[in-house]
């Protein structure tokens, strides 16, 4: 691998950028980015992946091109958090998400899911997982974190997140804590706006920073920034990613973090809309971010590289700091390449372990006095199709629906797919249809945000029919339901979850999960 002393200015700058592309094969525009601008790192999404063998071949091709053009192996990164944020297709083993794992009540499960994920990624050629989420989801109205967090207390997030870190590292994959210094207490998605968390340093130390400190102590080699304003820490109107006070002053100097600092995508609206991606990339580099992500648009990545080159040549970007950052990247890549991975077992063992944890995560937030209602002879399964509730999720629809999958399992009753935000006319029609059924099984997907789903739930509950309500993402949908409604947290809208849920619905299994939240008004009974 090329040393710092052997690198040109452009090669050094290229080590500090990660870029992405559309499609299953890298287009010429993306390959030019590597050849002309020496971009040395890659991010992959679901849009780039067909199956495991294709991903392995793609990673090998990309690694070869980057090594030939830059003399340094790339970090190939991916957001494989589990649950609602997974990039691997169903053909591979996908783990439950953070809050689901915490609902099992066993931190060892977080370690095993990290180890399993690392094994899956390494087998495909990916060496850097952009996980775990260390945000504390203390705001039920948070539109982007929710079930991606391990819970709403710093202690639980620290404990489970640190175990995930240890599992990923033992499995031979780099990982990053995100989103520093915290994205949990906001009602704005930084993909779409510019959130603000108005907390002092002491307040952050008491809550938001505790999981990050624990993750660093567990050995996390990287920390990802967040595009959020923290006005009591950074008085200038710039988000954490672009703030030297936060990146260098807080993370490096006060917390003593010596690993690599990476940015969230600089094409998110919190940066692109308010500051511009190109200017934001340079500001992040100057703030102390080692690896900056331009994940969607190769042309923007090229423009950002040109701008950074000009800044380095005119003295705006400090060359000594550039060298320190690049050396840190080179050492991180050498460390990653030298990892000696452990494994959890063969693919069948990994799949069985993920299914075991997923089944253990299903949580009864409330059960009627008589327990789970019986489905009867003619159950009604209903709910919306999944949709892209945040840009952090995959762009493609799953192609299956909760009602249809449950109807397939039951082999009886009716499946009814509703709108994601049903209006009064649709609600009235659904309630009318429900009257002929023995039991209502409604799956919601962020109904606490799209209120039509909750209006539908309450209208169906008012019929007095036996009813099971399943939250298929954030469990806040389950608040304030009548006592005769069984309320289950399923945590994700995936086929493996539906398979695990079916024995609970048909009465052959009990929901054993424990609610990892204090912010729900109904306690698990």
Each language-model region and where it sits:
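Short acidic/polar active-site loop segments enriched in Thr and Asp
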Residues: 40, 127, 221-222, 290, ...
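Second-shell residues forming the walls of enzyme active-site clefts
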Residues: 8, 20, 26-28, 47-70, ...
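Alpha-helical scaffold segments that flank or form the walls of functional sites
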Residues: 105-126, 208, 217, 280-286
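Preference for extracellular/luminal or secreted protein segments
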Residues: 1-37, 275-525
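Short, conserved phosphate-binding/catalytic loop or strand-edge motifs used
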Residues: 134-144
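A charged helix-plus-loop insertion that forms the helical arch/lid used to bind
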Residues: 92-105, 149-151
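Catalytic domains of carbohydrate-active enzymes, especially glycoside hydrolases
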Residues: 32-45, 115-128
């Amino acid at each position: 691998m090329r040393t710092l002393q052997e690198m040109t200015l452009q090669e050094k700058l290229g080590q500090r950028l990660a870029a992405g592309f559309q499609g299953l094969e890298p287009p010429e525009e993306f390959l030019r980015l590597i050849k002309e601008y020496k971009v040395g790192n890659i991010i992959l999404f679901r849009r780039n992946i067909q199956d495991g063998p294709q991903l392995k071949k793609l990673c090998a091709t990309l690694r070869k091109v980057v090594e030939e053009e830059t003399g340094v192996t790339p970090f190939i990164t991916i957001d494989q958090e589990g649950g609602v944020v997974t990039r691997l297709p169903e053909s591979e083993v996908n783990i439950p998400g953070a809050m689901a794992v915490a609902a099992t009540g066993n931190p060892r499960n977080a370690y095993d899911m990290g180890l399993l994920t690392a094994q899956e990624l390494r087998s495909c050629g990916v060496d850097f997982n952009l996980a775990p989420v260390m945000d504390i989801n203390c705001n039920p109205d948070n539109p982007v974190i929710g079930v991606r967090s391990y819970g709403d207390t710093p202690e639980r997030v620290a404990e489970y997140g640190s175990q995930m870190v240890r599992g990923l590292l033992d499995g031979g994959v780099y990982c990053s804590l995100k989103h520093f210094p915290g994205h949990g207490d906001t009602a704005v998605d930084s993909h779409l706006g510019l959130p603000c968390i108005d907390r002092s340093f002491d307040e952050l130390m008491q809550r938001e920073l505790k999981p990050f400190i624990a993750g660093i102590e567990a050995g996390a080699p990287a920390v990802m920034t967040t595009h959020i304003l923290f006005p009591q820490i950074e008085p200038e109107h710039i988000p954490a990613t672009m703030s030297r006070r936060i990146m260098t002053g807080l993370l490096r100097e006060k917390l003593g973090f010596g690993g690599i600092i990476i940015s969230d995508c600089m094409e998110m609206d919190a940066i692109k809309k308010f500051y511009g991606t190109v200017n934001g990339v340079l500001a992040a580099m100057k703030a102390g971010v080692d690896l900056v992500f331009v994940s969607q648009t190769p042309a923007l990545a090229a423009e950002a590289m040109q701008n950074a080159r000009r800044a380095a040549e005119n003295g705006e970007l400090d060359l000594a700091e550039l060298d320190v950052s690049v050396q840190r990247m080179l050492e991180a890549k050498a460390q990653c390449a030298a990892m000696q991975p452990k494994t959890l077992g063969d693919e069948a063992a990994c799949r069985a372990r993920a299914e075991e944890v997923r089944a253990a995560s299903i949580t009864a937030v409330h059960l009627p006095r008589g327990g789970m209602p019986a489905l009867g002879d003619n159950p009604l399964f209903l709910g919306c199709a999944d949709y892209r509730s945040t840009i952090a999720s995959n762009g493609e629809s799953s192609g299956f629906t909760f009602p249809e999958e449950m109807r397939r399992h039951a082999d009886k009753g009716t499946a009814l797919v509703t709108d994601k935000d049903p209006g009064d006319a649709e609600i009235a029609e659904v309630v009318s249809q429900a009257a002929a059924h023995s039991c209502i099984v409604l799956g919601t997907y962020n109904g606490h945000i799209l209120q039509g789903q909750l209006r539908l739930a309450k209208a169906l509950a008012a019929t007095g029919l036996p009813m099971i309500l399943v939250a298929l993402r954030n469990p806040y949908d389950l608040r304030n339901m009548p006592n005769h409604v069984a309320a289950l947290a399923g945590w994700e809208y995936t086929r493996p979850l539906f398979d695990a849920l079916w024995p609970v619905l048909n009465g052959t299994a009990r929901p054993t999960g424990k609610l990892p939240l204090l912010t729900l008004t109904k306690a698990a009974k």
